[in-house]
Amino acid sequence: MWKISNENDIFKKRKPLPPKKSEESQPELTPWQKQNQEYLKKQAEEAASKGENEQAEVTITLQEQSQEEPQQHLPQETVEEEEHFADRLPNVKKTRNKRLYRRLAFILTCLGTAILVALYFVSPLSRLSEVTVSGNKSVESQAIIQQSKLETGSGLWEQYSNRNYFSANIQKKFPIIKKANIKLNGINSFKIDIQEYQIVALAATKGGYHPILENGKTLAETTKAAESGKPIFENFKEDKLIPELMASYNKLPQEIKQGISEIKYAPSKTNKDLINVYMNDGNRVIVNISDLSEKMAYYSQVAEQMDKPGIVDMEVGIFSYPYEKESEETGSEVSEDSAVENQEVVDPNAGVATDEANNGTPTNGENQEVQQAE
């Protein structure tokens, strides 16, 4: 037989049943609503002391208010957030579409560029079609194109990237060319701009006249006739002398250059740097190559003080004298030299001497004795 325990023990051991869940779950309350409910509960507890009837009425009223107020008293921030999010939905879609369009445009641009570049290098436009020359005066255009080693029909950009090499070929072959600038001319053609050295003088040789450039180089080509207006350099057999002379000559004023007709190399025993500069006004200037640019600056002042053409000596100082004085000095020197050379040399072994005054008639010792007796 089972022993029935006390009713109180049975009720103590029985666990309380969990509250039944409402079919419709209530929305989560905000902190404001929770405080409101706590406030209502306090009022309900106070009203309970006054009477059950009043408590019931107050409870019913408060419950109705609590059910109506959650929607009426929602925080303004939550409502605004929902409104802002709804407003941003179209903007988000537009932003995404713009990004997609940009990426698509970038990809299409890259593909289109690659296709165009490939088509360009396959087409004849990427090959050199023509070469023209401008600025050349002394060298023919066809000779310049030929010596440049540029090839029509070959790659345009490959040759353009190596344009310095082709310019060097031209300058190496033609010393008169100072610069050869290769640049694009149109879609697939080149233009060579030539800048030449000026021919400032002529070097006189047995075969003719060689042009002398402003940088001191002497060209190998010869001309039979001298070009008017260009000074003539004579007796410059050493190659290094002309570049030294041109370094000083280029520093002269233009009016002095125009007044020079000829320059001769005239070294002395003691001075290997001496030259004679012949002027168009008839004067002759004696000066060192190294002093040419410095001392020739005073030539105009000295020439104005001269009464007639003569010599301007600038070897040591600066002074002038007429040609007659030089001829007298030269004549005296020549007479002294001729007297020394014409002295009779008697050979003791020679018995006969030739007298030019007697047309080669021999003179013996008997004639000498007759002359002595007379």
Swiss-Prot record:
The chain crosses the membrane at residues 104-124. It is found in: Cell membrane. Its main location: membrane. PROSITE patterns: POTRA (PS51779). Keywords: Cell cycle, Cell division, Cell membrane, Membrane, Transmembrane, Transmembrane helix. Residues 1-90, 325-374 are annotated as: Disordered. It holds the Pfam family POTRA_1. Residues 125-374 are extracellular. It is a single-pass type II membrane protein. Residues 126-197 form the POTRA domain. Coiled coil: none annotated. GO terms for biological process: FtsZ-dependent cytokinesis. This is Cell division protein DivIB.
